């Protein structure tokens, strides 16, 4: 799942999961509801609660740092200035019988973007160079790449490494070509990195 526009849509997703989720499915949830320390205006507490319930049913989730704070109740002000160990500890608090991996995305530290991959064995950090601000759609591309690779049989950490390499090239090219950030990134020539 990704962005959910209404309570009605969330309930349809829950009904689908009740019918089809089993040990042979991989449920990847990108709990889109917040960024840069702020919950999106269209999300009320009930919508945030619905996304949190979905995340708890997933096998893998990919919250950004703000979404991790919403899911865990941690302070964004504190966690955004913390090191990866503290972020991994917060992410690990979400792990349960179903949720086996939490990938915290897009953590900006100086000239680097970190992604923390936490599972029951611990955590790893996957980093890339930061190129200016953010481009529209990169979170969606990341989630799609990791979801596709894990369904194909890749471990979540390996899938994250490939997705980060894929996106780093696309973002670098878009930055160097002065692509309007609202138009997304030039990713097509990097699709081979996902094979």
Task: Give each language-model segment a name.
Residues 69-70, 132-156:
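Short, small-residue alpha-helix embedded
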Residues 1-53:
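Glycine/small-residue-rich loop that forms an oxyanion/phosphate-binding "nest" at active or ligand-binding sites
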Residues 157-195:
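Charged C-terminal helix
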Residues 4, 108, 139-141, 145, ...:
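Gly/Ser/Thr-rich beta-alpha loop segments that engage phosphate groups in nucleotides
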Residues 17, 21, 58, 98, ...:
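Structural signal for hydrophobic packing residues in well-ordered secondary-structure cores
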Residues 126:
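Hydrophobic residues at beta-strand termini and immediately following loops
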